[in-house]
Amino acid sequence: MEFMSSPFPITKLPLVPRCKILKFFDYGDLLDISLCSKRMAQTVRDIHITADLHYLTLGKDNQQSIQIQFKQEQKVIYWDFKLDLVEEEMPERRTVGAIVFEKCRKYSQREIGLFQFSSYHYDIEDSIGEVSKHLFYIFPTSIEIRLSVQFCRTLRNLFSYEHLQNIDVLTLLGSIMLQNVLEKIFSRVKIRRKLWVEPETDDEYPILQALHVENLHLASARWMTRDHLLQLTCCSVDFHEHYFGWKDLTVFAENWLNNKNSKLEMVRFGWPNDIDSLSANFEGLKTHKWDPKQREKKFLYSKDNRLHRIDCTKGLELERDDGELATWIYEPDPLTSSLYFLVWTERFPEKKRLEKLPKMLAPYYEQLVQLRKEYDDSCNLEWLLSNPNLKLDEFVETYRILRGMDSEVRLSSIGRVRRRRIFDEMYNIIDAQND
């Protein structure tokens, strides 16, 4: 007797079993389901799947895309907005909000967790806005925007979308950004966590909210005055070009000494000239030299998901009445030298970091155990790296040997790729130092 299949009416099920069934669907399929109707969009939203990141890239030409990242599952929804694909390459049709994409295509690589959508519409700005709005509705998370000067030249109403008016990170790229463009952005967008401004900006437009984000990078801070410097409530700051002089920096340090509520942890000032003596330039400050009993010699900070270190053995120390310690340190460089103001929220950061490593690495060892159950093609070195009892220096040495062999032998499998990802992340977390 031949088995006859029939449609299964998921939408007619009660909410709880309906959500449980939909959780078995891949994220790309859930997105397609949510586009069927407002009711289905609400149904997908009711599953309460929270993404890790909603990332918009708004560059030049065909460099407009949205990524929704699910880091724990190592899956990504990627939607790019094309300007030049021919109709035959995008035979599908999708409606997202107020936009009808007559040219669209879905391409899934489930084995690596990639669900890609490509689309064309003559109104690129509204297309991005509507797709982003829908994705944010069904997969709520923090939003980061990478925005180029070239895209801004035709910027109209992208930031009229409410969900894009309060974001976590804004990165501006390009050469020069004039006042009218800056007003279009900063009059509507509020940045909570990080602002990175690479273009040279109009000195007549002070970006005042830059003073109050957590992390700030200004390639051109020439619009800033001493008063702006004293108003900073950021944690981490990087000024590449500026007009600050020694008197400004002295007043800045004095303000920190008198402000126990300061959140500052790290400020970098690009410095075009050599500095022979810090103490000679900070004569009015009460300072002292490095004491190894007070702190470690290197200051640790994270940038671009990597750990960095600044040698502060020749630094100039300032100690506040409440015991908080800060260091002025000059770091010469052939391209761009740096003058740092560093606050030691943790005086022995490397020691504390090493103490935390076993707990940080534990989830990765659990993932490796699961991978051994799914894939039985591990080599001896991979088995060794999967051993949680392996000492850190032994892990580092074994990892380097394995990666050295990878450069000579290119044998590929899904299991190997997934294990390498984990080993790479573990190695970066350990971040072994030679000194």
Swiss-Prot record:
Residues 7-58 form the F-box domain. Coiled coil: none annotated. This is Uncharacterized protein F59B2.8. It comes from Caenorhabditis elegans. The lineage of its organism: Eukaryota, Metazoa, Ecdysozoa, Nematoda, Chromadorea.
